[in-house]
A protein has these predicted regions:
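Short coil turns that connect the paired helices of HEAT/ARM alpha-solenoid repeats
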Residues: 311-315, 344-351
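Alpha-helical adaptor scaffolds
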Residues: 284-318, 325
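Amphipathic alpha-helical scaffolding segments comprising HEAT/armadillo-like alpha-solenoid repeats
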Residues: 302-306, 333-344, 364
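Structural detector for internal amphipathic alpha-helices that build alpha-solenoid repeat scaffolds
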Residues: 321-331, 353-362
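Auxiliary alpha/beta "docking" domains used to position bulky ligands
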Residues: 1-132, 141-206, 254
């Protein structure tokens, strides 16, 4: 058994574990990783300081996998479709309703559900290598035959870059990974391994001359093809941004209250994206087009109960209420004015500021 045989073994394992796509990339200094330090230096990462983490050699960890794992030789990339049969954000109705990003509708935090499946692939990889110790060419004296690290959006690796070079999809002009058959509604899981496996060919870029994602972005966060300024991105503003949202960006946020799907909703490759039948990715009750009044005045107890095990808990109750109040300001519906007025007196300055802004907007 060789590196090709192992690759041929783990791909069916990924399929049986529930993944839709699986590919293998070598560990290299890809051009996109070379651009990453420049992107950070230009301030495009906003307040996401964790992206600036550096290794002992001073290099950005996410730009150089070898600086974190000197033994790394290959990366197994698995992708799973989370799309569901619900309307897109570009077509949702009702001014008193908000929008939560499709990935956050799920009944279980995707980190947990995807990692659980990824562990099955990792176990099969280890089993195959341990049964064929000659494959462990990089093993050091006294080291295990195979070293692995598995991550779902939590490790020191730019997953989508490795996904491209694993042939799973190409990087679109909206910076999302796009697969020709599945579209871009994909969760990624990666396994970094010390074993050199047969790599797949990179996926060709099929965006062509299309710029629909760039044209559709309300806050102009896509400053150039394949280039995102997170400071302007609605997903960043509603999830990662702490404190108040810059006033000049609030109107562009529309009624997005957690994340944003616009640049994916308008992508032609998602027109025929299949819907997942996996139970854990189906929408929780009330999260598709949620009532803005409910979100703005949700109690701490209700927030914890409703979003236990959900990625929405990342924004915290204060952030979600802030987002809902900005959405109320953008709704144009004066029936929501009492909510803005009540919350303008809230002791949380982030909430009261958003509510006061909403009042002003509704009076226009």
């Amino acid at each position: 058994m060789n590196g090709h045989d192992i690759a041929d073994l783990i791909k069916p394992t990924a399929k049986s574990a529930g993944f839709d796509l699986c590919g293998i990339a070598p560990v290299r200094n890809f051009p996109e990783l070379g651009r990453f330090p420049e992107w950070i230096a230009e301030g495009y990462a906003g307040e996401m300081k964790y992206l600036e983490s550096r290794g002992e050699n001073g290099k950005l960890r996410r730009a150089s996998l070898h600086s974190v794992f000197p033994w790394a030789r290959s990366v197994v990339v698995c992708a799973i479709n989370y799309n569901t049969a619900h309307p897109h954000s570009t077509g949702f109705n009702g001014p008193t309703r908000g929008w939560i990003s499709r990935y956050a509708w799920s009944r279980e935090d995707y980190h947990d559900s995807v990692l659980r499946r990824l562990r099955q692939v990792e176990a099969k990889l280890k089993e195959a290598v341990c049964a064929n110790p000659l494959l462990a060419t990089s093993a050091r004296s006294g080291a295990p035959l195979i070293e692995t690290r598995s991550y779902v959006d939590t490790g020191p690796i730019v997953e989508r870059v490795y996904a491209k070079y694993a042939g799973v999809g190409w990087l679109g002009k909206n910076t999302c990974l796009i697969n020709q058959k599945v579209g871009s509604w994909l969760f990624l899981g990666v396994i970094v391994t010390s074993v050199e496996l047969a790599a797949d060919l990179p996926a060709p870029d099929r965006c062509g001359t299309c710029t629909r994602c760039i044209d559709a972005c309300p806050t102009k966060a896509l400053v150039a093809p394949y280039e995102l300024d997170a400071n302007k991105c609605i997903s960043y503003l509603t999830i990662e941004k702490r404190g108040g949202v810059p006033e000049e960006l609030r109107e562009g946020m529309g009624r997005q209250v957690f994340g944003c799907d616009i640049c994916q909703d308008v992508c032609p490759w998602n027109r025929k994206a299949p819907a997942s039948d996996k139970p854990e990715f189906q929408a929780r009750e009330g999260l598709v087009n949620p009532a803005l009044a409910w979100l703005a005045e949700m109690s701490e107890e209700e927030f914890r109960e409703k979003f236990r095990g959900s990625p929405i808990k990342r924004t915290k109750r204060s952030g979600l209420r802030r987002n809902a109040l900005i959405a109320i300001g953008n709704s144009g519906d004066r029936s929501l004015m009492p909510i803005a007025e009540r919350n303008s007196l809230d002791p949380d300055p982030v909430v009261s500021d958003a509510a006061s802004w909403a009042k002003q907007q509704l009076l226009k």
